[in-house]
């Protein structure tokens, strides 16, 4: 204990760097380098050494920089680095989660209910066990010779600063050289690979969560500008409404984590969508999301193509389709089982109610707070707007982990299930629970359709992102450059009521939808804006609708008009 108290802050930083950089990243090293023994090359050996050294040196560099704030502040900040890294290491070790912007955005969401569902007893025990030793070192050390103290002391400035700068160079230079080597391989093979430095930064603690946290903070500042700073398509372009839109109801269901390759209507071996399979007025597409986390997808899936930056945080540049419809005369209500208030306010909805508000309603007391409560809210909304030209947005929990909590016991069709986050579930158990949740999604969508079956209505559905459910990877939120394909697989659907199809133009558009669905034409999130406008019958003479993205666009129409 006397030694712990007496060592300098620089030595303590190095010891902590070894602990965080090597021990907490142990599972990542094993996965990245495990295959090297069977296919070893000199460059692979060099890269392994470089990455091992980089994780230690970058942590040392960070801890020394933090000591510029003084001894007391350093203790607090270093403790946070340890705790955050220990927490992240749990998911990296046991769930093989890549800690990127999507994960940080999900953790920092105001929707605590969903976030806490992936925190169990095992996580807490791991956090305590892994962080105890470094926290003891931090709080029992005198923290002598912080970088701030050394810079103020003549004779120590150059040497102390040189050590920090050298650590930074020793991280950057080897990684840069390996990046250059990789570029040469890319040119020789014609294979496009992600940046080597970017892969390393996203793979290891603490650089992965620190860089993601920095992006999240920047995005929050970026989002603080209101809708007036965003391009407004309703003002930039001319939108001509069809004659028969004033009595139309539009419903958009935002799904959560549901994958099309686990839905029976797309050929999945289990009949997870028995009710949707009976809908004759439904066109269902194999879709691909614009990102892998809710907060990111909500930024890019409802704007025109290019309406969100192609950067990690998906900076918004334009107003979304719901805000445009509001400005075109639609009344609108938004009901959510989540709490993405930044997005909800951007829709310009007349009425917004999220989970806590809905659950507090007297009619909902004692009821489980799940997606079916949104159907009750929808009924109330329809009753208040009997004349149509009304938009209802429903943001669901869908198939979000913990899957078993997404559906009532009566939908537990496939067993055994994955009961809890700490239960050590097998892949089969997780799939059983996931498929049960998809069946409940089927029930929910069908229930929504039932509310407008006798009205002139169109219902859209699109999940925000997919999910990884296998031995190597779980959950979602992986940076999209690194994400596996299943995190992008989302079902996208359009349903039109019989009354809506009484209009010949709408019937023709639906026939086009069915034709493309039968041909298994893949669809994308970035096509939703133009599709919603197009399927409602809006036209734009000055480019407000990209017909290439409009699923309801009939290619022969132009030829017929020309003749």
Map each language-model feature to its residues.
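Transmembrane and membrane-interface helices of multi-pass
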Residues: 1-196
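Extracellular glycan-modifying ectodomains
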Residues: 86-88, 157, 176, 361, ...
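Active-site-proximal alpha/beta segments of enzymes that process anionic O-linked groups
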Residues: 174-419, 489, 524-558
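Active-site-flanking alpha-helical
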Residues: 263, 449, 471
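Histidine-centered active-site microenvironments of extracellular/periplasmic hydrolases
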Residues: 267-271, 457, 462-505, 545
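A short beta-strand-to-alpha-helix junction
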Residues: 312-319, 428-440, 480-489, 501-532, ...
């Amino acid at each position: 204990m006397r030694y712990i108290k007496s060592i300098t802050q620089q030595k303590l930083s190095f010891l902590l760097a070894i602990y965080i950089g090597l021990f907490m990243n142990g599972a990542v090293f094993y996965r990245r380098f495990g295959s090297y023994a069977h296919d070893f090359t000199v460059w692979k050996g060099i890269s392994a050494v470089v990455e091992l050294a980089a994780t230690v040196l970058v942590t040392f560099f960070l801890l020394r920089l933090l000591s510029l704030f003084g001894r007391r502040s350093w203790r607090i900040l270093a403790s946070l680095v340890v705790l955050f890294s220990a927490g992240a290491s749990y998911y990296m070790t046991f769930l093989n989660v890549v800690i990127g912007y999507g994960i940080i955005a999900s953790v920092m969401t105001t929707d605590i209910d969903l976030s806490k569902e992936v925190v169990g007893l095992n996580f807490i025990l791991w956090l305590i066990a892994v962080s105890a030793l470094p926290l003891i070192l931090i709080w029992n050390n005198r923290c002598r010779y912080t970088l701030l103290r050394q810079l103020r002391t003549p004779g120590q400035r150059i040497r102390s600063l040189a050590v920090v700068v050298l650590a930074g160079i020793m991280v950057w230079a080897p990684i840069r050289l390996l990046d250059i080597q990789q570029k040469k391989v890319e040119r020789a093979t014609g294979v496009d690979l992600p940046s080597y430095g970017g892969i390393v930064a996203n793979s290891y603690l603490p650089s992965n969560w620190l860089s993601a946290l920095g992006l999240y903070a920047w995005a929050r500042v970026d989002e603080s500008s209101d809708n007036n700073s965003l391009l407004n398509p309703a003002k930039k372009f001319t939108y001509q409404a069809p004659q028969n839109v004033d009595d139309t109801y539009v419903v958009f269901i935002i799904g959560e984590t549901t994958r099309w390759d686990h839905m029976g209507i797309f050929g999945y071996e289990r009949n997870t969508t028995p009710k949707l399979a009976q809908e004759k007025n439904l066109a269902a597409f194999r879709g691909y999301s614009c990102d892998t986390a809710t907060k990111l997808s909500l930024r890019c899936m409802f704007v025109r193509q290019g309406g969100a930056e192609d950067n990690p945080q998906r900076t918004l540049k334009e107003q979304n389709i719901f805000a445009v419809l509001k400005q075109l005369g639609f009344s609108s209500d938004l009901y959510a089982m989540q709490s993405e208030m930044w997005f909800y306010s951007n829709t310009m909805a007349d009425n917004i109610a999220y989970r806590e508000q809905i659950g507090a309603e007297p009619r909902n007391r004692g009821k489980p707070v799940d997606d079916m409560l949104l159907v009750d809210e929808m009924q109330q909304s329809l009753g208040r707007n009997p004349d149509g030209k009304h938009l209802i947005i429903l943001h669901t929990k869908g198939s979000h982990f913990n899957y078993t909590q997404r559906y009532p016991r009566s939908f537990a069709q496939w067993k055994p299930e994955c009961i809890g986050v700490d239960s050590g579930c097998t892949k089969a158990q997780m799939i059983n629970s996931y498929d049960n949740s998809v069946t409940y999604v089927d029930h929910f969508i069908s229930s929504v359709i039932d509310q407008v079956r006798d009205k002139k209505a169109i219902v859209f559905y699109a999940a925000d992102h997919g999910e990884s459910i296998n031995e190597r990877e779980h959950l979602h939120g992986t940076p999209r450059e690194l994400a596996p394909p299943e995190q992008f697989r989302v079902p996208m659907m359009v349903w039109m009521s019989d009354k809506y199809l009484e209009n010949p133009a709408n019937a023709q558009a639906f026939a086009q939808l069915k034709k493309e669905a039968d041909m298994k034409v893949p669809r994308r999130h970035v096509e939703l804006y133009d599709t919603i406008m197009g399927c409602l019958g809006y036209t734009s003479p000055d480019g407000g609708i990209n017909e290439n993205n409009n699923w309801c666009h009939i290619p022969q129409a132009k030829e017929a008009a020309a003749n």
